[in-house]
Every structure is written in structure tokens, then in C-alpha cells.
């Protein structure tokens, strides 16, 4: 029921254009400074891409918290969920903070009483989904869009909508991420099923859509021309187009960009609650949200 609630929410926020929220309030609270700041170890489980962790997360967090050691475990959302599920069964949760892209999972954890209620002073600036008691809050927004290779397709010839992907002219030439591995793909599937019914995916199957392990595999095969167009995260396309001048282009679907709020939460089992809270404060602050934007995602 909780997943169904979030999937319906995702369908409700199918937008005709990309909404870019502000990067925190002007009076956001600084999480810490070099004097009297949080100390100790904090573990973060996240689905943020490894290169973004290395180039954006680690240096910014290290600068904000010089006396705190933050360790990152990265994996696809469903891989992280599988890891946590095993840890819960063993009564040995290994992380303090969670940042993955399956919003419904946070509701499951909250129902199980596993999340720490913490109302960050910056929570008031979050305009996307959040829990009023602070058990979780959106920290970044991911957009699922259609992408194509502009060396292979002219803009006027590219798919203009999700429904366009069912056109027989794209048979065997389209792809999507595996929703069993990708949290954003999972939410996208729910949103499209809610909008068009499950027969939409029967049509995609008949059109020989290929299911790849993740967004990175899709971007690479778009570049080689193996696929003409694909469902993919906007951030993948923007990063390649702007940093490597690759010929990938975004087609914002006329029947709605799928906007996916991705939350942050603290486990009650944390061994360093003050450090974990400081990290949440930072992510929801202006500095943290600017770091999100540097990672080609959208702020909350």
C-alpha cells in the first residue's frame, strides 16, 4: 500500500516542464564549523553515482565537517535496499544515513519504526515531499525523461512523448533501466502504469524494448547508436552533454516529465546521532543543495 501511494504520487507529478526549485533559504543554518563541530564516524548508504560521490559529495562534506569521518557505500537503489533488508533481519543496521531513490521505501522503514524523527532547522525550506516529524525529507529531485543521440536523430524526428515509444518505427531501437535494480525506474514504471495502464508495457514489450541494468549502460548504448532513444535520468544526459560535449539530447515528454523526489533519513540505530543530524542539516542547507545541483540533479 505504501509503494502504491508513492507510485500514484509520482504519476500525479508528471509535469510538462522541469520544475527547478530554489537552493535552500537565505537563512539556512550552517551544519557545523571547524570549532565545536560534529566528530566521529558517519556511514551513508546511497544510490548517488560513484563519480558524483567522489567529485561532489566527498570534498564538500569533508570541507563542512573536518573533524568527522563520513564513509559512503554506493549501489543501485534496489541493491542498497537488499543490503539493508539483510541487516534488519540480522538486527545489525550498518548505516547511519540513507539516501536512495525509492521514496516508498522510506515509508516502509517509517512504518517499521526504524527511522529517527529529526526536524532539521532547514526542513522548513524544503518545498517537495517531506515528513512533518522529520523522519525523512526529499534531498534531491531526479527527473526521468527521454534521450536521443543528436548525431543519429534530428530533434524533430525524436520521440516527443512516452506514448511515442510504442510506435512500431522504434521497434528494437528503444531501452529503459531495469526497475528491479533502479529505484527511479521503479517509480517511473508505476507512474506510467497509473497514467496509461499496464497495457502500455505490453505495447513496449511488443515493440521489443530492451531492459538494461541501469542508466549508465543506456547512455553508453545511446552514444554508440545501438539505441535510437531511451528512458533515462536527465542528470546522465546533462552531465555528458555539458562536461564531455557528447551528442545526447533531452526530449522532455509532452505527456509529462516524471519527477522523483529522493529522500534522506537517519536510522534510529545510528551510533552517532549528532553527526548524522549535522549531515542532514548540511544536505538541506544552501551549500548542500548547491552541491546537489553541481551533480546535475535538482534541488528541493
Task: Name the predicted role of every residue range.
Residues 37-38, 43-71, 79-82, 146, ...:
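Short, polar/charged alpha-helical segment
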Residues 47-55, 73, 77-78, 93-227:
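Extracytoplasmic ligand-binding site segments that recognize negatively charged/polar headgroups
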Residues 53, 142, 172-180, 203-204, 211-212, 246-268, 282-300:
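Periplasmic-binding protein-like
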Residues 57, 200-203, 262, 271-283, ...:
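Short amphipathic alpha-helical coupling segments at ligand-binding clamshell hinges
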Residues 104-108, 228-247:
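A ligand-binding cleft/hinge motif common to bilobed small-molecule-binding domains
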Residues 147-152, 190, 260-273, 291-292:
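A bilobed periplasmic-binding-protein/Venus flytrap-type ligand-binding module shared by bacterial periplasmic
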Amino acid at each position: 500500500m505504501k509503494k502504491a501511494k508513492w507510485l500514484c504520487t509520482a504519476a500525479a507529478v508528471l509535469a510538462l516542464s522541469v520544475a527547478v526549485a530554489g537552493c535552500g533559504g537565505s537563512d539556512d543554518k550552517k551544519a557545523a564549523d571547524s570549532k565545536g563541530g560534529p566528530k566521529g564516524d558517519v556511514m551513508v548508504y546511497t544510490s548517488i553515482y560513484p563519480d558524483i560521490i567522489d567529485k561532489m559529495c566527498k570534498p564538500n562534506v569533508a570541507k563542512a565537517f573536518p573533524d568527522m569521518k563520513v564513509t559512503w557505500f554506493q549501489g543501485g537503489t534496489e541493491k542498497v535496499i537488499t543490503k539493508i533488508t539483510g541487516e534488519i533481519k540480522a538486527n545489525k543496521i550498518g548505516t547511519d544515513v540513507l539516501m536512495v531513490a525509492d521514496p516508498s521505501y522510506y515509508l516502509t522503514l517509517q512504518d517499521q519504526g526504524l527511522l529517527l524523527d529529526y526536524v532539521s532547522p532547514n526542513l522548513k525550506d524544503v518545498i517537495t515531499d517531506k515528513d512533518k516529524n522529520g523522519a525523512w525529507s526529499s534531498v534531491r529531485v531526479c527527473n526521468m525523461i527521454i534521450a536521443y543521440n543528436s548525431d543519429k536523430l534530428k530533434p524533430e524526428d525524436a520521440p516527443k512523448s512516452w506514448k511515442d515509444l510504442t510506435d512500431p518505427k522504434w521497434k528494437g531501437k528503444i531501452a529503459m533501466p531495469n526497475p528491479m535494480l533502479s529505484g527511479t525506474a521503479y517509480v517511473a514504471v508505476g507512474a506510467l502504469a497509473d497514467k496509461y495502464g499496464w497495457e502500455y508495457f505490453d505495447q513496449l514489450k511488443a515493440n521489443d524494448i530492451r531492459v538494461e541494468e541501469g542508466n549508465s549502460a543506456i547512455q553508453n548504448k545511446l552514444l554508440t547508436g545501438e539505441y535510437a532513444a531511451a528512458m533515462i535520468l536527465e542528470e546522465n544526459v546533462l552531465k555528458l552533454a555539458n562536461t564531455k560535449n557528447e551528442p545526447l539530447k533531452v526530449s522532455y515528454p509532452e505527456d509529462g516529465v516524471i519527477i522523483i523526489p529522493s529522500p534522506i533519513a537517519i536510522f534510529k540505530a545510528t551510533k552517532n546521532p549528532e553527526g548524522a543530524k549535522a549531515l542532514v542539516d548540511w544536505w538541506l542547507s544552501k551549500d548542500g543543495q548547491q552541491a546537489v545541483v553541481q551533480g546535475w540533479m535538482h534541488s528541493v
